[in-house]
């Protein structure tokens, strides 16, 4: 008996994979940018109101 190997396709194109990869990369870049903007805003608030922030933090028990 001869054995035959069958090859099955993955069902998707490489273009689909590339497209979804670039969409994921764009999303990561956007989230990174938004996170950086938020952290910058927090830094600005802390620079202006550091004493108030610490006082409120201590009143809440540091949680």
From Swiss-Prot:
Cite the residue spans of the region called Disordered: 1-36
Q: Name one GO molecular function term.
A: protein tag activity
The segments labelled ARC ATPase binding in the record are 20-57
Coiled-coil stretches are: 23-51
The UniProt keyword set, sorted, is: Coiled coil, Isopeptide bond, Ubl conjugation pathway
For the cross-link Isoglutamyl lysine isopeptide (Gln-Lys) (interchain with K-? in acceptor proteins), the position is 63
Q: Does the keyword Coiled coil apply?
A: yes
Q: Which Pfam families match?
A: Pup
Q: How is it modified after translation?
A: Is modified by deamidation of its C-terminal glutamine to glutamate by the deamidase Dop, a prerequisite to the subsequent pupylation process.
Described by its record, this protein's role is as follows: Protein modifier that is covalently attached to lysine residues of substrate proteins, thereby targeting them for proteasomal degradation. The tagging system is termed pupylation.
The family assignment reads: Belongs to the prokaryotic ubiquitin-like protein family.
| Quaternary context | Strongly interacts with the proteasome-associated ATPase ARC through a hydrophobic interface; the interacting region of Pup lies in its C-terminal half. There is one Pup binding site per ARC hexamer ring.
Protein's name according to its UniProt entry: Prokaryotic ubiquitin-like protein Pup
Q: Which organism is it from?
A: Mycobacterium leprae (strain TN)
């Amino acid at each position: 008996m001869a054995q035959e190997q069958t090859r099955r396709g993955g069902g998707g194109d490489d273009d689909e994979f590339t497209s979804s990869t670039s969409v994921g990369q764009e999303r990561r870049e956007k989230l990174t940018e938004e996170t950086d903007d938020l952290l910058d805003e927090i830094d600005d608030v802390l620079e202006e109101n550091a004493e108030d922030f610490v006082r409120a933090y201590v009143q809440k028990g540091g949680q």
